[in-house]
């Protein structure tokens, strides 16, 4: 019995049934289902799983978001996180990617190429979604894409006035994607007062950010309106918005707090990149510098590849540097490198939601910013060989490996031994330490060789710190004790 003829007893509604019939008879290829919230998109994916004859795997940025799919799929539901799926050799007849817009395009391509049939689903026009920018940006990667849309609500009545009120209040409209901003582009700044003096312009910027960035939320809208330390640059083409840049002030921490962050004694809220420069970098005073982090940057799909994004970056100003934190892909890094950014950090593990390592980069603006950027980049180059081997991912910087311990290594090792520096941050210095000493250090050597399975995580970390302290004291007792005394003072400040 065709699904389109099934009775209305918790089974597919007409729109869902028509799409299900098409999917169940689909030859090899990629299909995409987009819908606003409440249209039964996840239920449809679960029904597809329960109806197919072969095997299937489901992936999504978060497993919790697939509960509806699991409920409809029953025993046919098999979930793997994007990073785990990428690293596996799993084969199946179908791949279901829920909220596909949250997964970087290059990773989405890699995953889709491994399965004969792929269904991409994503929410549009809502705080969980990314607008029709998903179809323009991601689905253009797949030739012969079959596109389907659900428009009839299943959680509430069609034409619900509350849904329209919420959509209007939270600027869920994405009609801006249909309009091409034509003409010469000029760059201007956007001040918070724009929401009173010219709300249409502020709305245009927010709608562009929603279309370009997954999960731009009403909280972001509130921040745009009244949060301190926010700066906006806009690329205007006539009356239309062609591009937008959102910067957030960071850094400027007191020296005492910056040192405590470096040592792992403190983790105050906010200051994403500024704190990371201290906590994962080599300078205890890194977080004292002032910078502006790129929170969002977007260019209208019809005006991309014209250099507008680079112009927005060049127009930006900051105290010491501009910074950016992003899920690393070759494509994204190519853009940031063209803007003049320098890679200063690569995360130690893939994010389960995106399958990407977190990368951080700086664009120095002041002399102090140049010094910090050069120091952080040189550290990354010097450690690159060890970090790449440990992560299993090549870091796109010059290999400047040195096996000899230097003063930066001594400070790093003391921070690990006598404070709370992370193992992943200190792993290159620890590798050089093992090359420099002729001592057993069984926990350290076993950890490096991947053979330490007899310890719990906390117990092993304590043992690693203990052995590092012992090695430093054997190498140079006065030096190790002076560093220990200095670092221990950094946990006390006004």
What spans do the regions from the language model cover?
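N-terminal pre-P-loop "Q-motif" helix
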Residues: 8-27
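Pre-Walker A (Motif I) flank of P-loop NTPase domains
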Residues: 26-31, 230-231
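Walker A/P-loop nucleotide-binding motif
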Residues: 31-43
